């Protein structure tokens, strides 16, 4: 019998500085948004609004919006969840299946419901207190992925709720919603001594390898773009940026990208330190090829899951 969720690891052996470069890139660039823009529309449960919003913010949404991973990572798309639930004598609890899930196209603000796996019925979120006919508990809330711009256009698309109530409750809380992009990394990634390791969760209802490919393709593209945009100051070293003096052959390392790339070509550098190094040894295109080969190796290793 296949389990709905399994914990696995993907391990590839790489040159240590390249493994560190990929790990740091993953942790800094692969940002899956949390549901931190939450609005409680009605609540007669025993849990206060803050408890509901905290629980909803950290719903593991990647396993629900798995068909849209690349566009969510590029922020072309966002998402929202909506819950309207009343306690009954028969149903005294709430699972993740009780939510409705919607993808948001940020160009058009269109809101489209997505299918939800029946396995979400196994993930409990809340248990109501003992049912009483005259005091049935209810909860209605909506939460948007971080970075979603709430405006009249997108609110007009929320045809499944009372817009007047939404506007009132949103105006009550919008000043305390964190304006920064709030996110988590999809996986834990480590790279001790070049052993690049991804600790992943695999679910039975979708193709994890396809999702991983979307993530790695995004990461590779973002890293290559960063490499092309990266610059090292040439001239006197002033200890504010990574810089290289061709006359003395001294390199001052002040950022992780410079450190990892020069170490790949034989330097033994550390952050905020000077090193005598011949920068003509650095071949950016060779490093990019090694990066692309490493990404292929990661995807190949995932085929063994």
UniProtKB/Swiss-Prot annotation:
- The record's top EC class is transferase
Which residues belong to the signal peptide in this entry?
none
Which reaction equations make up its catalytic activity? RNA(n) + a ribonucleoside 5'-triphosphate = RNA(n+1) + diphosphate
Task: State if Coiled coil is listed as a keyword.
Answer: no
Any one Pfam family here would be Pox_RNA_pol_35
**Which EC number(s) does UniProt give?**
2.7.7.6
- BP terms from Gene Ontology: viral transcription
Q: Which GO terms describe its cellular component?
A: DNA-directed RNA polymerase complex; virion component
In alphabetical order, the GO MF annotations are: DNA binding; DNA-directed RNA polymerase activity
Name the domain of life: Viruses
Spell out the subcellular localization from the entry: Virion
UniProt KW Membrane keyword: no
Q: Which UniProt keywords apply?
A: DNA-directed RNA polymerase, Nucleotidyltransferase, Phosphoprotein, Transcription, Transferase, Virion
The UniProt function text for this chain reads:
Part of the DNA-dependent RNA polymerase which catalyzes the transcription of viral DNA into RNA using the four ribonucleoside triphosphates as substrates. Responsible for the transcription of early, intermediate and late genes. DNA-dependent RNA polymerase associates with the early transcription factor (ETF), itself composed of D6 and A7, thereby allowing the early genes transcription. Late transcription, and probably also intermediate transcription, require newly synthesized RNA polymerase.
Quaternary structure note: The DNA-dependent RNA polymerase used for intermediate and late genes expression consists of eight subunits 147 kDa, 133 kDa, 35 kDa, 30 kDa, 22 kDa, 19 kDa, 18 kDa and 7 kDa totalling more than 500 kDa in mass. The same holoenzyme, with the addition of the transcription-specificity factor RAP94, is used for early gene expression.
Q: Which family does it belong to?
A: Belongs to the poxviridae DNA-directed RNA polymerase 35 kDa subunit family.
According to UniProt, the name of this protein is DNA-directed RNA polymerase 35 kDa subunit
Source taxonomy: Viruses, Varidnaviria, Bamfordvirae, Nucleocytoviricota, Pokkesviricetes
């Amino acid at each position: 019998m296949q389990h709905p969720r399994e914990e696995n690891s993907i391990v590839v052996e790489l040159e240590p500085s390249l493994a560190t470069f990929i790990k740091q890139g993953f942790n800094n660039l692969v940002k899956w948004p949390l549901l931190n823009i939450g609005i409680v529309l009605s609540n007669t449960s025993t849990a206060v609004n803050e408890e509901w919003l905290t629980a909803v913010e950290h719903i593991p949404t990647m396993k629900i919006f798995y068909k849209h991973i690349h566009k969510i990572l590029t922020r072309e798309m966002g998402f929202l969840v909506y819950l309207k639930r009343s306690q009954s004598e028969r149903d005294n609890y709430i699972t993740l299946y009780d939510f409705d899930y919607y993808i948001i196209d940020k160009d058009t603000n269109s809101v489209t419901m997505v299918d939800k796996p029946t396995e979400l019925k196994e993930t409990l979120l809340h248990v109501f207190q003992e049912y009483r006919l005259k005091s049935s508990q209810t909860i209605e809330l909506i939460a948007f992925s971080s970075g979603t711009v709430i405006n009249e256009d997108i609110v007009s698309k929320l045809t499944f709720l009372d817009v007047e109530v939404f506007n009132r409750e949103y105006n009550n809380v919008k000043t305390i919603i964190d304006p920064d992009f709030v996110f988590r990394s999809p996986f834990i990634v480590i790279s001790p001594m070049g052993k690049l390791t991804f600790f992943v969760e695999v679910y039975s209802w979708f193709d994890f390898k396809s999702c991983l490919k979307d993530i790695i393709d995004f990461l590779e593209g973002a890293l290559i773009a960063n490499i092309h945009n990266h610059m090292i100051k040439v001239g006197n070293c002033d200890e504010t940026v990574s810089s290289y003096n061709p006359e003395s052959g001294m390199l001052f390392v002040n950022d992780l990208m410079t450190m990892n790339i020069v170490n790949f070509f034989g330097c033994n550098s550390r952050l905020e330190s000077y090193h005598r190094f011949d920068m003509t040894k650095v071949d950016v295109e060779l490093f990019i090829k090694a990066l692309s080969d490493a990404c292929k190796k990661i995807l190949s290793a995932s085929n063994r899951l």
